């Protein structure tokens, strides 16, 4: 798990066994940014969703296939980060989660600040700077 902000964290794939610990850490929402069946052995989001309900966590399924970033996904992520609930987002490596967060965050903050936060979380999205500038300008 990598901290992006005090209220937004990203991670690689989780399992149902991880959910109780995530709940103990004070998260209120888990977001799945990964479609089912990307690889053998991946825990289906429905199992994660059920376990979230059993642990009083809100679950949101926002699957993003690699290379299929949409304005709808960005808008939904924007809504999430504006709620300011402690949110745990996961995908295969965390890269899709941090990408969606960055695209949403530039609507609120400067691109350079956003990329700095991304880098501090251990990711490199500098190649998306022009794209993020376009989102910021729109």
Where are these regions (language model features)?
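A phosphate-binding catalytic loop at a beta-strand-loop-alpha-helix junction
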Residues: 88-98
């Amino acid at each position: 798990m990598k901290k992006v902000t005090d209220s937004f964290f990203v991670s690689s794939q989780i399992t149902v066994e991880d959910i109780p610990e995530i709940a103990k850490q004070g998260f209120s929402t888990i977001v799945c940014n990964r479609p089912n069946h990307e690889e053998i052995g991946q825990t289906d989001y429905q199992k994660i969703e059920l376990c979230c309900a059993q642990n009083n966590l809100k679950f949101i399924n926002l699957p993003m296939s690699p290379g299929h970033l949409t304005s709808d996904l960005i808008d939904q992520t924007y809504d999430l980060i504006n709620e300011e609930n402690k949110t745990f987002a996961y995908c295969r490596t965390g890269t899709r989660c941090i990408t969606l967060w960055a695209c949403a965050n530039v609507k609120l903050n400067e691109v350079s600040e956003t990329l700095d936060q991304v880098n501090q979380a251990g990711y490199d999205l500098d190649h998306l700077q022009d794209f993020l500038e376009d989102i910021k300008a729109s």
